[in-house]
């Protein structure tokens, strides 16, 4: 099938709200010509994908052409909003408006431990309400969902149950395939393409609980500012982070770049954990394994184990606490970090993080 062909009458040219008449020929011609899409065209394309009307060839061409052109924040905003509109909704008011997500794009090519998952548990134990969005492994041996499942956490809960989990335990988990069933149309294409595309950005941008704060890891330094622009448009309080060693986390092996999003603005900063007393780690210190191996590491850290993994977990949990503090216009950068690091360390040392994980497991067992 030629890329400009339409597979059905339903895929014929349509006029997105407020935008130009659109077809795959027009969308792909603009992208392959190196031009940004007109307003509404990215939304049109994503709706075609989410409703199953786009062919695999059209999905692949769109993903690759958008990546080569380099997506803009405006385009990614449209893609993410359409995806959220197709997601399972939460009941109005079910999730409090100061929740935090801790998640990364993946795709850094390094099989690290599930640092964001551990950091989410620690941040929740420090008193920050967490609603984490995640999935099974794509490029690593064990994704956050795989590790949580191995720990005994239920990952198959729907919106009402996740909202209860956040309210009663302090943390909840939105399993991406359950909340985004329409996104399945991209799965085979993404696997077959085998290289990162704009779709890698969408997971952290489409938490169906719509948290207002987050520590968001981006493995692609050139696209981190695009993600930050999306969060700025939402007026979220977010730290978009890229380890200068390539990790989609705050790293302890070197410095990280942070795009601090607050009150609709974006500031780019270089962050050195050595300034807070963290010793330099080696990347090998942070490597993970399968779900069983990673779950054992979670238990060891939450039980009070010392070393580079704990350091990385405390650092990332503190980053989430800082992002949460940023929901207040009174938050100051260095004091917020000092507070976040102290609270994250105390959550482990007091046993609060270990106890929270046990409560989370029991919550799922009792449903």
From Swiss-Prot:
Gene Ontology molecular function: anthranilate phosphoribosyltransferase activity; magnesium ion binding
Biased composition (Low complexity): 1-21
One GO cellular component term noted in the UniProt record for this chain: cytosol
Named cofactor requirement(s): Mg(2+)
EC numbers: 2.4.2.18
Top class in the EC scheme: transferase
Residues noted as binding anthranilate 1 in the record, renumbered to the chain: 104, 135
Positions with a binding annotation for Mg(2+) 2: 248-249
Catalytic activity, reaction form: N-(5-phospho-beta-D-ribosyl)anthranilate + diphosphate = 5-phospho-alpha-D-ribose 1-diphosphate + anthranilate
Residues that hold anthranilate 2 according to the record: 190
Record SUPFAM superfamilies: Nucleoside phosphorylase/phosphoribosyltransferase catalytic domain (SSF52418), Nucleoside phosphorylase/phosphoribosyltransferase N-terminal domain (SSF47648)
Pathway in which the depicted protein is active: Amino-acid biosynthesis; L-tryptophan biosynthesis; L-tryptophan from chorismate: step 2/5
Keywords linked to the UniProt accession: Amino-acid biosynthesis, Aromatic amino acid biosynthesis, Glycosyltransferase, Magnesium, Metal-binding, Transferase, Tryptophan biosynthesis
Family according to the record: Belongs to the anthranilate phosphoribosyltransferase family.
Described purpose of this protein according to its UniProt entry: Catalyzes the transfer of the phosphoribosyl group of 5-phosphorylribose-1-pyrophosphate (PRPP) to anthranilate to yield N-(5'-phosphoribosyl)-anthranilate (PRA).
HAMAP family the record matches: TrpD
Protein name per the record: Anthranilate phosphoribosyltransferase
Species whose genome carries this gene: Mycolicibacterium paratuberculosis (strain ATCC BAA-968 / K-10) (Mycobacterium paratuberculosis)
Gene name, Swiss-Prot/TrEMBL: trpD
């Amino acid at each position: 099938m030629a890329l400009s062909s339409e597979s059905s009458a339903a895929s014929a040219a349509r006029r997105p709200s407020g935008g130009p008449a659109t077809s795959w020929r027009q969308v792909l011609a603009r992208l392959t010509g190196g031009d940004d899409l007109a307003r509404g065209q990215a939304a049109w394309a994503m709706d075609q994908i989410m409703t199953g009307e786009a062919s695999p060839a059209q999905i692949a061409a769109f993903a690759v052409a958008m990546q080569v052109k380099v997506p803009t924040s405006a385009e990614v905003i449209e893609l993410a909003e359409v995806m959220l509109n197709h997601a399972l909704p939460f009941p109005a008011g079910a999730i409090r408006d100061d929740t935090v997500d801790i998640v990364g794009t993946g795709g850094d090519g390094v099989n690290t431990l599930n640092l964001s998952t551990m950091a989410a548990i620690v941040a929740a134990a420090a008193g920050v309400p967490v609603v984490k969005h995640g999935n099974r492994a794509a490029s690593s041996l064990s994704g956050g969902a795989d590790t949580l499942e191995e720990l005994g956490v239920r990952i198959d809960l729907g919106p009402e149950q996740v909202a209860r989990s956040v309210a009663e335990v302090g943390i909840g988990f939105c399993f991406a395939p359950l909340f985004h069933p329409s996104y399945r149309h991209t799965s085979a294409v993404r696997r077959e393409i085998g290289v990162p595309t704009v779709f890698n950005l969408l997971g952290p941008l489409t938490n169906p609980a719509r948290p207002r704060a987050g520590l968001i890891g981006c493995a692609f330094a050139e696209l981190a500012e695009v993600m930050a622009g999306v969060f700025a448009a939402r007026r979220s309080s977010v730290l978009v982070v890229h380890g200068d060693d390539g990790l989609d986390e705050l790293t302890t092996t070197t410095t990280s770049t942070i795009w601090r999003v607050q009150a609709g603005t974006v500031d780019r900063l270089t962050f050195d954990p050595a300034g807070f007393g963290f010793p330099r780690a080696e990347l090998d210190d942070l490597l993970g394994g399968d779900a069983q191996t990673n779950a054992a590491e979670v238990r060891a850290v939450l039980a009070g184990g010392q070393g580079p993994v704990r350091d990385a977990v405390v650092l990332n949990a503190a980053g989430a606490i800082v992002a949460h503090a940023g929901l207040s216009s009174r938050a100051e950068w260095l004091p917020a970090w000092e507070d976040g690091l102290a609270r994250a360390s105390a959550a482990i040392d007091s046993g609060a993080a270990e106890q929270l994980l046990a409560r989370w497991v029991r919550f799922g067992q009792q449903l």
